[in-house]
């Protein structure tokens, strides 16, 4: 399905993402809506996991206006870098846009993993991403969430969540976050 067959007024119809092969090598740009509808197009993405000094992870509830996985709970932020932008630069930008968190509030933002996945969401579309995982520790937990992006925030003991995800099923976790958490060897 092309973006012509989807609501072209949606903001995603005016954005591009980076199409990649299975090894995360760039293959060009693709319309963001096309990448997330029909059979989709594999593209570059990231999810960032921020922790406090007590090893709690900051989960963010995706806003109800999101096309995919609306109101689901995610790792701290997730998005797509734009052409010419590193994963770290893209993450710094999203942290500031979504949560009002600037680089002076955290340390050691780094890529810790990368994986490919493909998941469909209801009848709304899909994610087919090579997803980088970034992690950092917040030493200043002051937050100013953007209500257009985030409906809620929650600090959760990370090891408890990793070891007993069944305790948190009512949160409806985003699939990319669940994969990143299962694969996490950093903590």
Curated annotation (Swiss-Prot):
Pathway in which the depicted protein is active: Isoprenoid biosynthesis; dimethylallyl diphosphate biosynthesis; dimethylallyl diphosphate from isopentenyl diphosphate: step 1/1
Positions that bind Mn(2+): 36, 43, 80, 127, 129
One Gene Ontology MF term: metal ion binding
Enzyme class: isomerase
Domain of life the protein comes from: Archaea
PROSITE patterns (UniProt xref): NUDIX (PS51462)
Keywords recorded for this protein, A-Z: Cytoplasm, Isomerase, Isoprene biosynthesis, Magnesium, Manganese, Metal-binding
Cofactor: how bound: Binds 1 Mg(2+) ion per subunit. The magnesium ion binds only when substrate is bound.
EC number, as in UniProt: 5.3.3.2
Active site per database record: 129
Cofactor(s) listed: Mg(2+); Mn(2+)
Binding site for Mg(2+): 98
Compartments where found: Cytoplasm
Swiss-Prot/TrEMBL catalytic activity: isopentenyl diphosphate = dimethylallyl diphosphate
Known function: Catalyzes the 1,3-allylic rearrangement of the homoallylic substrate isopentenyl (IPP) to its highly electrophilic allylic isomer, dimethylallyl diphosphate (DMAPP).
HAMAP family named in the record: Idi (MF_00202)
Protein name: Isopentenyl-diphosphate Delta-isomerase
The encoding gene: idi
